[in-house]
């Protein structure tokens, strides 16, 4: 392991180390949000709402592919970070090689299971009429690219786990920029509409994966793709999946949650869906900054969990303070200029009014959301698979009964407030789980929670 990487893991100031690992993740997350908006923006130029709906309906499938990548990426990545903290540089090769080829095999399985059933899957996602054909076409390209989508998530996580977050950011940046360029060429130049958008995403993932592969082959003696190291032991399997499975489950349940929420909103018409769509995109900016912050420090927490628990506690304190500052700034902006922000996306008075209300409520949940991200990250980083699994289930499931109750009592307003209620429950549960497991994390965890 290079001295520069060890410096940020062990010797730099807590804030400097946190920024080194988290800023690339935050930038990469924001680029993904921007890309998502631009993707819809480009398709919107074609003037066909069915195409826009098709892309939106495929989001749960993307969540599944991301979850499969996280299974080995987060599971293997956090284990690699813990092995580096324990100075076990040989076992990292076995973990990385097994994770990479395991992810590729999962991708091939996805292709075999789905490629001849895209229309049926599109129908299950809610596609009807003209939207069905566009959704099926988009899904076909998405499924064919599954091995590289999964591989991209694995390799990006591995770059961060070995202390190379800048490389992770470059890979994500290259993917997003190439995606935007290809969208423009394929959608408009070749008139491929949604298929062009899907191909742009697929090709960009292939290129980004190749970038990571070349980097690891040339620069890393920790991550390997050699088949000779694909020898999973019981210990390796347990350590990868006890952290990776909760991350996988979280992605799956987030996709299910989004699908259920859309079904509830659909009962109030397009105005409700459009209003939530706008507010959701705006909330995503600070939310993904915080998510990037929390995900970025996972390797730092994992490393110091093995070597310096006092430093780990300080890292967690600094992250919490940073989340509070981000939350405060966002609340001031939303409550002073929220109406104007929504107006950028729509001039419909009803949509602007409802979206502004949704924005204020959902932004209020940002602090609790951030705490949930951090404590779940702590559980992942320290190998507490059972606690992380419970959190993953709660974050995906709690919202559903809350939606039923609040919708029945208060209608659309209740649906909006259900988001804040669910985040409150999950944040409290996360703090309780970490408190109960405090002896397995660090003896100072109780003091941290009380403080």
From Swiss-Prot:
The chain crosses the membrane at residues 26-46, 54-74, 98-118, 134-154, 162-182, 194-214, 245-265, 282-302, 315-335, 355-375, 397-417, 418-438. It is a multi-pass membrane protein. The keyword Transport applies. It is found in: Cell membrane. The keyword Ligase does not apply. It comes from the Bacteria. Signal peptide: none annotated. One of its GO terms (cellular component) is plasma membrane. One of its GO terms (biological process) is response to antibiotic. One of its GO terms (molecular function) is antiporter activity. Keywords: Antibiotic resistance, Cell membrane, Membrane, Transmembrane, Transmembrane helix, Transport. CDD domains: MATE_MepA_like. Its main location: membrane. NCBIfam families: matE. Belongs to the multi antimicrobial extrusion (MATE) (TC 2.A.66.1) family. MepA subfamily. Multidrug resistance efflux protein. This is Multidrug export protein MepA. The lineage of its organism: Bacteria, Bacillati, Bacillota, Bacilli, Bacillales.
């Amino acid at each position: 392991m290079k001295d520069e990487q060890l410096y940020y893991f062990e010797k730099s100031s807590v804030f400097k180390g946190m920024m080194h690992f988290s800023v690339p993740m935050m930038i990469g997350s924001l680029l993904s949000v921007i890309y998502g908006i631009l993707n819809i923006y480009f398709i919107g130029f074609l003037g066909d709402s069915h195409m826009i709906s098709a892309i939106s309906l495929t989001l749960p499938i993307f969540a599944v592919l991301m979850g499969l990548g996280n299974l080995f990426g987060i599971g293997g990545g956090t284990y690699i970070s813990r092995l580096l903290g324990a100075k076990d540089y040989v076992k990292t090769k076995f973990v990385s090689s097994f994770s990479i080829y395991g992810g590729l095999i999962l991708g091939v399985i996805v292709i075999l299971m789905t490629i001849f059933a895209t229309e049926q899957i599109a129908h299950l996602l809610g596609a009807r009429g003209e939207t069905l054909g566009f959704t099926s076409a988009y899904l076909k390209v998405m499924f064919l690219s599954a091995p590289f989508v999964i591989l991209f998530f694995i390799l990006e996580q591995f770059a961060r786990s070995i202390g190379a977050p800048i490389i992770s950011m470059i890979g994500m940046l290259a993917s997003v920029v190439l995606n935007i360029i290809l969208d423009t060429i394929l959608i408009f130049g070749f008139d491929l509409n949604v298929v062009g958008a899907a191909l742009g995403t697929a090709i960009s993932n292939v290129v980004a994966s190749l970038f990571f592969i070349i980097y690891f082959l040339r620069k890393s003696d920790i991550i390997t793709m050699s088949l000779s190291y694909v020898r999973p032991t019981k210990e390796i399997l347990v350590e990868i999946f006890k952290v990776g499975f909760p991350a996988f489950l979280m992605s799956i349940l987030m996709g299910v949650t989004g699908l259920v929420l859309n079904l509830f909103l659909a009962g109030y018409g397009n105005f409700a869906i459009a209003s939530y769509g706008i507010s959701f995109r705006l909330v995503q900016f600070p939310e993904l900054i915080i998510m990037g912050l929390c995900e970025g420090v996972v390797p730092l927490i994992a490393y110091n969990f093995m070597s310096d628990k006092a430093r780990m506690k300080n890292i967690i304190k600094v992250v919490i303070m940073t989340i509070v500052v981000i939350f405060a700034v966002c609340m001031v902006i939303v409550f002073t200029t929220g109406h104007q922000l929504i107006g950028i996306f729509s001039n419909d008075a009803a949509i602007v009014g409802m979206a502004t209300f949704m924005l204020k409520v959902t932004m209020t949940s940002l602090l609790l959301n951030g705490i949930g991200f951090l404590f779940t990250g702590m559980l992942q980083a320290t190998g507490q698979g059972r606690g992380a699994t419970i959190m993953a289930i709660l974050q995906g499931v709690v919202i559903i009964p809350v939606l039923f109750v609040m919708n029945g009592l208060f209608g659309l307003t209740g649906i909006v407030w259900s988001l804040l209620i669910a985040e409150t429950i999950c944040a409290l549960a996360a703090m309780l789980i970490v408190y109960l497991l405090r002896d397995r994390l660090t003896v100072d965890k109780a003091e941290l929670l009380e403080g």
